[in-house]
């Protein structure tokens, strides 16, 4: 490969809400520049996981290098760094934006700006990126490019007079997009002479070569055979394969400032090459790492248990393998009296949790029971120690704790104004604090609430979508911890506490939640030969109870006529048997019961 002057490199990413056509646009750019031959082309070329294709979302980052012959007669190298659009993966988005100098802001011309797009645009503005607005899907009958331009100008404050009208599906506007990338996106700074610093924006595990790291060289040069040091994990490796992604891997000897590529160096796990880490040479180390690195902290926790206890080792192996590819996933073994052995897992958010669960079931053939998700609480004990609790069963007793603090998030919803009332009700019902409301162009409104994360992780998103008929969109970010009167709600079935059903709730909501949960469990647990009591309690005080009546076998069926004492004897024998059964009997609790906590209205 010929060496490219820095002035002829353009690094850009595409920012878009889910479903606004980002992956299709990337496909068209790859085709238009001849990077991928038409015969190799398939839909969503850069989305490699089956799950990404099915859900139509981008989960793992990808990158592609395109050679483009511009109208000014020069050859340019365009590096597209793809970003995931979902709020759970916002840290990955910020890292891939840090590797760029410009971004295409893709907005659906019929839908307008959505909350997720906003969150990512603000990230892009923080990184001082040149933003090029693109209105996609203008071939749709419902497209209103003028209205959407107004909306972008009003909400984001971007000048849209030069916005490109495009339809990725039909291939309209693609040449204009390529030209504007060359004209408007600034080239990287020429820092080839400085000490090597490169930013890792993604890494994945390959079972033959170990971890493959995707990176962007910020300063200096990197060559095959170099010994490099990762500044956050403080580990050193020798590069045995270096190359560029066009989109398939093509080896090269060296890469210099401004270029994007990959390397492998016998790294064992993705944790050792974290997203956002800085690569430098072991011999000539750079003084400071690149700014912005932070380790991904899980926000949502839940228990994963195999339905068949024999699958426990398989579950451990599957989690170990997923962890190689997913540095944000955390897990530790836990035991539950109700469910046996399993794992307590931590995730970035609900989507991340669903994806991990789905991958475990699909790729590793496991059958899982998932307990209700909880968040991390900060508990100050009576000895003035602060401990973090992610499992309701480890909450210290009331006499051993001073206070409990829970994480709060700032939730921003964008909605058509006719749904404002019902979404405000939703915010209030989730202990939300109303912060702000703005009217936007064309009858849309933003609502801002501060809500405890625990209220958001259960079914807030589903509720918001159903109340707004799917039109509202949201994004949230953590703002800190606040003290609240929280209590642990225990559920007892047949006088035995079921640890997997315990939850931490606000004291004022405990009675209602306990009542609703007991009623729900009564519907879901099948009847047994004996009466099954269900109780919800706080400490030793029972606040709600229900009974599942016993199935009654007719023992008198074969007694014709006659002797009452014979019937009495049979009935007493049955009563005795039921009594014994009640003291020894176990109650089967189906999987739906454990998920009931999620679906309390």
From Swiss-Prot:
Catalytic reaction equation(s): GTP + H2O = GDP + phosphate + H(+)
Residues the record lists as binding GTP: 19-24, 136-139
EC number assigned by the record: 3.6.5.n1
Subcellular location: Cell inner membrane
Alphabetical UniProt keywords: Cell inner membrane, Cell membrane, GTP-binding, Hydrolase, Membrane, Nucleotide-binding, Protein biosynthesis
GO biological process: positive regulation of translation; translation
EC top class named in words: hydrolase
Cellular component GO terms held in the UniProt record: plasma membrane
Membrane topology: Peripheral membrane protein
Family that this chain belongs to: Belongs to the TRAFAC class translation factor GTPase superfamily. Classic translation factor GTPase family. LepA subfamily.
Protein name, UniProt field: Elongation factor 4
Protein's organism: Trichodesmium erythraeum (strain IMS101)
Gene name, Swiss-Prot/TrEMBL: lepA
